[in-house]
Amino acid sequence: MHRVAVVTLRGYREWTESLGPRREHIIQRVQAGLHMALWRHFTSIGAFPHHTRYDAAVALVNNIPTTLIEKAVDKLKKASPVPVEYCIGTGPTPYEAYLSCGEAAGDGDNYAVLAHMDMVDSTHVTRANGPLHVYLQILHIISDLGDLCKRLGCIALYLGGDNVAVLLPEPKAAYEIAERVPVPVRVGVGVAKRPYTAFVKATKALDYLRSHGVVGVKVLK
């Protein structure tokens, strides 16, 4: 089983509205701090976190003790202007674990499987068409992956640039993803007991594909 934590900021919208109309620069500064704190404290326990919205985040927490997750959330609270809540779900896929959040927080003892994906030759495309073109392509890919992941049981997350992370149920799902996205991609896949270790392996696999000029999927266990 896979295990996913969902972190939410209670009353965040009301807090933003309390700042008045000249507020966006304050909101963006706070959100940057929240993003930094989320990554610092969750990766320090071996989890893989990411914001879905800045008032909510998900984290793959396979094989991470609940006590450590609680400590990470407690540290995140110090960066938040509002109360922080979380729940944990388990399921046969990361997506199903996300959907079951709060219902049954089992052990989540499956090995974590993560992908690190990027577009092929995005630097050339950016030079030719500008960064907005690539950004819109990535948004299109994320949208396509959102629908595909509902069937495969994965969760796709935008990392910035032309990089996407995908929480996978198993390595073979990466091959279908690579086939179905609308542009050529490289997909590094990592498998490990702890999620962040799996993502480090995925990045190593992606770096190998990049350095060897290979398009496709590489799995590192």
From Swiss-Prot:
Protein name listed in UniProt: GTP cyclohydrolase III
Top-level taxon: Archaea
Catalytic EC class: hydrolase
HAMAP family: GTP_cyclohydro_3
The protein's Enzyme Commission number: 3.5.4.29
GO MF entry, a single one: GTP cyclohydrolase IIa activity
Pfam family, one: GCH_III
One BP term from GO: biosynthetic process
Keyword entries, A-Z: GTP-binding, Hydrolase, Nucleotide-binding
